[in-house]
Swiss-Prot record:
Native species: Saccharomyces pastorianus (Lager yeast)
Gene expressing this chain: ACB2
Residues at which an acyl-CoA binds: 29-33, 51, 55, 74
Source lineage: Eukaryota, Fungi, Dikarya, Ascomycota, Saccharomycotina
Single GO term (MF): fatty-acyl-CoA binding
Gene Ontology BP, a term: fatty acid metabolic process
PROSITE patterns (alphabetical): ACB_1, ACB_2
UniProt keyword annotations, A-Z: Lipid-binding, Transport
UniProt keyword Transport present: yes
Record-annotated ACB domain positions: 2-87
Classification via SUPFAM superfamilies: Acyl-CoA binding protein
Function: Binds medium- and long-chain acyl-CoA esters with very high affinity and may function as an intracellular carrier of acyl-CoA esters.
Pfam families: ACBP
Similarity comment text for this entry: Belongs to the ACBP family.
Protein name (record): Acyl-CoA-binding protein 2
Length: 87
């Protein structure tokens, strides 16, 4: 189960004044999924479904990382994005 701070940071991402880059969003996605679900056990999307494939890869890259560590990294990453895009 994720912490209240994690949930607050997940909401804060949507309130950034500037949309993060695609790479930043993929990093967030992977960390979010690893923190909330754990290791990726989904089938890799087909080659013609690039958006879902990139998201799958971002999550797959974190396989083996504990949900707690992923949550901590997600919170720190969001804090960095807030500092970057709110100044």
């Amino acid at each position: 189960m994720v912490s209240q701070l994690f949930e607050e940071k997940a909401k804060a991402v949507n309130e950034l004044p500037t949309k993060p880059s695609t790479d930043e969003l993929l990093e967030l996605y992977g960390l979010y999924k690893q923190a909330t679900v754990g290791d990726n056990d989904k089938e890799k999307p087909g080659i013609f479904n690039m958006k879902d494939r990139y998201k799958w890869e971002a999550w797959e890259d974190l396989k083996g990382k504990s949900q707690e560590d992923a949550e901590k990294e997600y919170i720190a990453y969001v804090d960095n994005l807030i500092a970057k895009y709110s100044s």
